[in-house]
A protein has these predicted regions:
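Structural motif
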Residues: 32, 46-49, 70-71, 89-92, ...
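Short acidic, Gly/Ser-rich segments with clustered Asp/Glu that frequently serve as metal-coordination loops
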Residues: 39-41, 48-62
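A short alpha/beta connector and helix-capping loop motif
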Residues: 57-78, 84-91, 96
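Short, Lys/Arg-enriched N-terminal segments with co-localized hydrophobic residues
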Residues: 10-29
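Hydrophobic, aromatic-enriched interface-forming segments
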Residues: 154, 164-178, 185-186
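Long, charged alpha-helical interface segments
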Residues: 87, 105-142, 156, 161, ...
Length: 280
């Protein structure tokens, strides 16, 4: 059980009381692009938000909150197994075609990985969409992940960084087919940056059950795509942090950045996050 953000305060999501000169499109502004799939990741510039709602980057938020010591995204299965050869204690997590990779400890499923399995562990994560985009967005100045569960935190982070260019990259299915949930997430983040409500947000989220998430409701698919994953991954604004990719001699490493770390209390004021207890 943890206490997480349910509704981020307005001062984090609007331009009021902040350095606002470049946040609105059309005003000597932040250029916000929505890109698609692996090719979009390769084209990403500026601050890149690599989006994979179902399920890679929703899962990484849950793993972080459950106490993972370190998250290392890798592109290939060979890289993942090489990690295990160097360090037998690592946990291998990921999928190909949605299913758990042979030889891995867990699949890409937030509902099936308990906190006790990940607490204090180094996790090597490889998927067919999300981690592919993250590792291939090499022309971006900075890379963070995005999903519905931390979308408002992503918008707040972007505002604090105030880059000239933002690339919202929708990774889709296997990085080659567009997915409505990733586009919805990108448009939601953009709407927060522009202070413009996204029309039909609730209805579009609900409609994912019949579109991008329909396989989570197939009784014959529950081993690979449990229904619980859909509900966990489509919660909005659950976590008040972002995951930023940094690089060291071992490769990419995801760094947790809490909203409270973005700037001082004097700059942001003393407003508190409204929270409620949420089971993760």
């Amino acid at each position: 059980m943890g206490v997480f953000c349910r509704d981020l305060p307005l001062f984090l999501l609007s331009g009021r009381g902040m350095m606002t000169g470049k946040h609105k499109k059309g005003e000597n502004d932040m250029d916000i692009q929505i890109l698609q799939l692996i090719e979009g990741a390769k084209q990403a510039r500026g601050l890149a938000v690599i989006i994979d709602v179902l399920r890679a980057f929703s899962l990484e938020c849950y793993l972080t909150q459950r106490g993972a010591a370190e998250l290392r995204p890798v592109r290939t299965l060979e890289e993942a197994f090489a990690w295990r050869q160097r360090d037998p204690s690592v946990l291998l997590v990921g999928e190909r075609g949605g299913a758990k990779c042979e030889g891995f400890d867990y699949g890409n499923s937030p509902s099936t990985i308990p906190a006790e399995a990940v607490r204090g562990r180094r996790i090597i994560h490889s998927t067919s969409a999300g981690t592919q985009g993250l590792t291939q967005a090499v022309h971006a100045d900075e890379r963070i992940t995005g999903s519905l569960v931390n979308a408002a935190a992503v918008a707040a982070y972007i505002r604090a960084r105030n880059p000239e260019t933002v690339s919202l990259v929708c990774m889709g299915n296997a990085g080659v087919r567009e997915a409505p949930e990733d586009l919805l997430c990108a448009e939601y983040i953009r709407s927060l940056l522009l202070d413009r409500p996204l029309p039909d947000l609730e209805a579009r989220t609900d409609a994912l059950r019949l579109r991008g998430g329909r396989h989570f409701f197939d009784p014959d698919n529950q081993e690979v795509f449990p229904e619980a994953d859909f509900w966990l991954c489509t919660k909005r604004d659950l976590f008040p942090f972002v995951l930023r990719a940094t690089e060291d001699e071992l490769g990419l490493r995801m760094e947790k950045v809490d909203l409270s770390d973005l700037c001082s209390a004097a700059a942001w004021g003393q407003a508190a996050l409204r929270t409620e207890k949420v089971e993760v």
